[in-house]
Amino acid sequence: MRLIPLATAEQVGKWAARHIVNRINAFKPTADRPFVLGLPTGGTPLTAYKALVEMHKAGQVSFKHVVTFNMDEYVGLAKEHPESYHSFMHRNFFDHVDIPAENINLLNGNAPDIDAECRQYEEKIRSYGKINLFMGGVGNDGHIAFNEPASSLASRTRIKTLTHDTRVANSRFFDGDVSQVPKYALTVGVGTLLDAEEVMILVLGNVKAQALQAAVEGNVNHMWTISCLQLHPKAVVVCDEPSTMELKVKTLKYFNELEAENIKGL
């Protein structure tokens, strides 16, 4: 696992965006061989999306031959709802870059057959071979996507019940009203995530410090979903300074020295 320790949330977003752009450009995608990118929602990736849009407008990257798969979507929330992940992605990213509509893949939380929707999503991912790079965030309790604590590390795209803590955390997007936050969501599984060629997780703020410590210094444990990254051959964790509060000094020193060349110029 790589750990990229940076000072601020803005630097985390810029580093992540630069990493994605470098990966896309090195891949040299075409219509017949697109770059497949997994994407998250929430507050954490906003600076990364902003930086990606800026780099696109500066001519540094094109998303014309990029295919995206989003991590999750609420169940029962109309896709036109301002807090649906469909709306979030278009508002913060898709509407500002040159990605073709047919290349965008989002789970349908209102599908008449939820099991079929989840199965078809997995099949579509497999039809591209694999996801080349999956970017994600992490919850205070270590969840990735909506793989809450005790999720199977072999899980696939499915419906999940959201914990009360997750709904409280997400209520900030619903005027602070927990009752407005859906109780269920469709989410890619931990196994889906681990199948990606590369996984990049962004960690921001002191509320995520325990999760980061579990990911980097703890054991692989289904109660801390983020610890699954230890099983991945190409995992990158990009974090800001407040999120490193629970790490040992020698751990942080080790990664700062290891990644010194890669964190310049931000």
Swiss-Prot record:
Enzyme class per UniProt: hydrolase
Pathway linked to the protein: Amino-sugar metabolism; N-acetylneuraminate degradation; D-fructose 6-phosphate from N-acetylneuraminate: step 5/5
Record text on activity regulation: Allosterically activated by N-acetylglucosamine 6-phosphate (GlcNAc6P).
Listed GO biological process terms: carbohydrate metabolic process; glucosamine catabolic process; N-acetylglucosamine catabolic process; N-acetylneuraminate catabolic process
Keywords in alphabetical order: Allosteric enzyme, Carbohydrate metabolism, Hydrolase
Domain of life: Bacteria
Reactions the enzyme catalyzes: alpha-D-glucosamine 6-phosphate + H2O = beta-D-fructose 6-phosphate + NH4(+)
EC number of the protein: 3.5.99.6
Residues making up the signal peptide according to the UniProt record: none
GO terms assigned for molecular function: glucosamine-6-phosphate deaminase activity; identical protein binding
Catalytic residues in the record: 72 (proton acceptor), 141 (for ring-opening step), 143 (proton acceptor), 148 (for ring-opening step)
InterPro entries associated with the record: Glc/Gal-6P_isomerase, Glucosamine6P_isomerase, Glucosamine6P_isomerase_CS, NagB/RpiA_transferase-like
PANTHER family: GLUCOSAMINE-6-PHOSPHATE ISOMERASE
Stated role: Catalyzes the reversible isomerization-deamination of glucosamine 6-phosphate (GlcN6P) to form fructose 6-phosphate (Fru6P) and ammonium ion.
Subunit structure as annotated in this protein's UniProt entry: Homohexamer.
Cited NCBIfam families: nagB, PRK00443.1-5
Name of protein: Glucosamine-6-phosphate deaminase
